[in-house]
Amino acid sequence: MKSLLILLLAAGLGSAQNIPYPAARDLIARVQTHLKHAADFGNHGDVKKVKRDEKEIERYRNAQRKASDFDRNLSKGKFDKGELDSLIGDLKNVIEHNTLESQDRDALTDDIRDLRDFRAQ
């Protein structure tokens, strides 16, 4: 039984090593979490509801779509620098034009920095 457990654990670790771009995929997951949190601003807690216009909503959708597309391609082992640049541009649009809490603005700004660092590697 113990050897079976060790074998299963080793197989799991071996398959985890085959994931293309694991650090980048973790970064994209973090970006998506931060975008979702920012998009939820005004929809929970005691925060006065923020009226969203269609352009704000579309900026969130564009950034989430780009992040998802980029992650999908990374999972297939494909890295597209232009696609990453497009994602960074959409994140900048959210930061520059959407109503955000300071912590969300800071998190997304940090994400852009980290994406640029990844791109430079």
Model-derived regions, located:
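Sec-dependent N-terminal signal peptides
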Residues: 3-12
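Immediate post-signal-peptide N-terminus of mature secreted/exported proteins
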Residues: 16-61
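Short, solvent-exposed mixed-charge patches
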Residues: 17, 120-121
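Short, charged, amphipathic alpha-helical segments
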Residues: 25, 50-61, 81-89, 105-113
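Charge-rich, solvent-exposed alpha-helical interaction surfaces
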Residues: 27-30, 34, 66, 87-90, ...
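Charged, low-complexity interaction regions
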Residues: 39-52, 75-79, 98-106
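Long, amphipathic, charge-rich alpha-helical segments that form helical bundles/coiled-coils
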Residues: 60, 64-99
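Short, Lys/Arg-rich, disordered C-terminal segments of secreted/exported proteins
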Residues: 94-120
